[in-house]
């Protein structure tokens, strides 16, 4: 009887913690949506990546209020996506390039460290690309996407 009661209390505590997290996540998500809408007010802002125009991951819900004219849906080809972002930045746009998982951003590191990172130096200050990179890190709630989709590579980018 005591074990069943203890187990019931533990389950109730887990439920209450999950409910609190839902509330926090909702507030956090709302702030992301507000920031995306604020960025979209500027004519030079372009959103590109996977699931920016069609559902497919949690990031989609943060851009669904943005005008379709400001969004470019892309297939899975991360290196090209970063290259496109750099090209858009050269033309005066501010691309907001979305990688649904940090693991996917790793595939774009060549463009990031060999081109985006060096362009201001190579062009002697003529080009200063402004690119906003969005990704999610280590999400295991509500769905654990497994080891290849929940890694945190933050230290590698420092």
Regions found by a protein language model. Name each.
Residues 2-158:
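Thiamine diphosphate
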């Amino acid at each position: 009887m005591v074990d069943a009661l203890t187990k019931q209390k533990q389950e109730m505590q887990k439920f209450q913690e999950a409910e609190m997290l839902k509330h926090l996540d909702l507030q956090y998500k709302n702030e992301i949506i507000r920031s995306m809408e604020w960025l979209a007010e500027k004519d030079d802002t372009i959103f590109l990546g996977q699931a920016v125009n069609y559902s497919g991951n949690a990031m989609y819900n943060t851009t669904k209020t943005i005008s379709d004219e400001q969004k470019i849906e892309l297939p899975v080809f991360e290196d090209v996506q970063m290259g496109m972002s750099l090209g858009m930045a050269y033309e005066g746009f501010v691309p907001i390039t979305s990688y649904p998982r940090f693991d996917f951003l790793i595939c774009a590191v060549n463009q990031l460290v060999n081109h985006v990172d060096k362009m201001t130096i190579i062009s002697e200050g003529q080009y200063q690309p402004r690119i906003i990179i969005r990704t999610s890190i280590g999400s295991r709630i509500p769905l654990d996407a497994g080891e290849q989709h929940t890694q945190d590579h933050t230290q590698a980018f420092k």
